């Protein structure tokens, strides 16, 4: 298994993996090929895939705004879970973010995503009960939660 930086040419395989992963929150704009191209252009060194025999089996989308890091859309293929791949992807993203001067990283997980929440707790991410996450769409977004 190899961890490498994600490229736009990985998009179709990565998107298929996201669709096959329960608990993902996708939408038609941000997660389109154009949306991911924009994200990778802004964050060229912080997004990674895990590959085995030329097949993408894991992905982590992470980036920052110069002050805080954020992790989006982390997934490992069902048959490859519980083998340390997710942790290796997180380590790669965290190391890259740290190298870019980022000192704190946040993420959002659906409350009902028990598997995802257990994974992130194991990775050392704490729940912030004193915060309420809010969002507002400023474009016509179609949600596609898995």
Region locations from a protein language model:
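Conserved acetyl-CoA-binding loop-helix of GNAT-fold acetyltransferases
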Residues: 76, 82-95, 122
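Conserved GNAT acetyl-CoA-binding A-motif
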Residues: 97-109
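Conserved beta-strand-loop-alpha-helix junction that forms the acyl-donor binding cleft
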Residues: 107-116, 135-138
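Terminal substrate-recognition subdomain of acyl/acetyltransferases
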Residues: 122-123, 132-146
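Conserved beta-strand in the GNAT
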Residues: 49, 55-63, 70-75
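A short helix-loop-beta-strand connector motif used in the catalytic cores of GNAT acetyltransferases and
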Residues: 37-49, 70
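A short beta-loop-alpha structural element at the N-terminal edge
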Residues: 2-16
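A conserved beta-turn-beta hairpin within the catalytic core of GNAT-like acetyltransferases
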Residues: 63-72, 81, 127-131
């Amino acid at each position: 298994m190899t961890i490498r930086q994600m490229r736009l040419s990985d998009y179709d395989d990565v998107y298929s993996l996201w669709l096959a992963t329960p608990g993902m929150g996708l939408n038609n704009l941000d997660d389109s090929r154009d949306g991911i191209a924009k994200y990778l252009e802004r964050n060229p060194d912080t997004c990674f895939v895990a590959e085995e025999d030329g097949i993408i089996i894991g992905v982590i989308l992470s980036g920052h705004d110069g002050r805080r890091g954020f992790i989006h859309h982390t997934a490992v293929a069902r048959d490859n879970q519980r083998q340390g791949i997710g942790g290796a992807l997180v380590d790669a993203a965290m190391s890259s973010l740290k190298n870019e001067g980022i000192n704190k990283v946040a993420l959002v997980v659906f409350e009902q995503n028990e598997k995802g929440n257990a994974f992130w707790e194991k990775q050392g991410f704490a729940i912030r009960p004193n915060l309420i996450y809010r969002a507002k769409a400023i474009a016509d977004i179609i949600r596609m939660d898995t």
